[in-house]
Amino acid sequence: MKNVKNILITGKNSYIGTSLKNWLMREPDKYKVDTVSTRDDSWKEKDFSQYDVVFHVAGIAHVSSDPKMEELYYKVNRDLTIVTAEKAKVEGVKQFIFMSSIIVYGDSSSSKRVIDRNTIPTPSNFYGNSKLQAEEGIKHLESDDFKIVVLRPPMIYGKGSKGNYPKLAKAAQKLPVFPNIDNERSMLHIDNLCEFIKLMIDNKESGLFFPQNKEYVKTSEMVKLIAEVHGKKIWMTRIFNPVLRLMFGIGIVNKVFGNLVYEQSMSDYDKVNYRIRLFEESIELTEK
């Protein structure tokens, strides 16, 4: 088939990898997509030379503070990324797309926190540090013939996603009241991410990118919206706010009610609109 892009996704059963494959396969005349598991070493025998693009999403995605996990995080998130990129380059792949994360900038904050292009990454745990070291470990491989894209998305959500979103969605359907705290988060719906990656592939991009939804999200407004989609009523109250503010040192409180946003202009992409889902629609799609 003429002009078909051959794409290999590492991370066979990952939420993002599976979502991207389904997204691209809607246009089978443009994309051929394979996936490979990296859980054992058998992937090293795979011939990468048949692929134009490797999308590397294999990794440990959710933060652990268990020191016993630290070595594994570096082995999987850093070392595996570097070895995969080296293999891709040696075997003639033209573009390597790496899923990093906003986590390289550290945790959310009890006060407003806006990341701009001049913000220096300061990871606060070994998950963030392993991602940042992976970025740094593949930089030197870039050349005219081997383009590298690094994506640092914020929290990704969508139907079937993992992490904090489904926990909040469950709370929205069960709790009669929820704290109304003024916070702002950058988020990214899975369809917007997949469309963005498609543009990276189509335009043979290289560089560092910060895709996010058009709108910032206030946690209480998101929970209210989720409840409404399910026909539930939830009362937003500020009565718990003083107690919650004292608890911002606790990880889960900070993750749910903290502030962490990208400055909006960082996420624009050459006037091309990859944000095909606005926030309200994205919640309806996720919850239906």
Predicted segments, located by residue:
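Glycine/proline-rich active-site loop of Rossmann-fold NAD(P)-dependent oxidoreductases
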Residues: 132, 145, 156-167, 199-209, ...
